């Protein structure tokens, strides 16, 4: 298998991830495939990237905000001779702010509880905030609709097996 850099939804790179396939599913890494297949072997019915959740809706801001111009804007400005400053200038943005969305790697159900498994090889800078927002989303799901969930972030098959033990113990204690 060839090791490559691949892009994921939030435009962050997974470095040295090996794309791979199994059961007709294209996984973004070997670890995702291993975790998925392990869940199958243990008798679960995992879904790979089952759904994308909107954690914060996109919006049109009322507050004026300024950001550096894009490379295209800078190139156009320099070409037109409007301002020959070589660095990027601040420009007012009026465009819609895109929402924050999150797609968990794996979801399955166990005794009426939805279980989310986030398979991590390496973290990226966006993941931490999305993880917090998703856990808050799951809390609200329970408070408003009484839907129980559990969330696990695993970095190895060993951690997955530990997560399975926790899931089973949690179910037995009720």
Predicted regions and their residues:
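Electrostatic, structured charged patches in enzyme active sites and in nucleic-acid/phosphate-binding
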Residues: 1-174
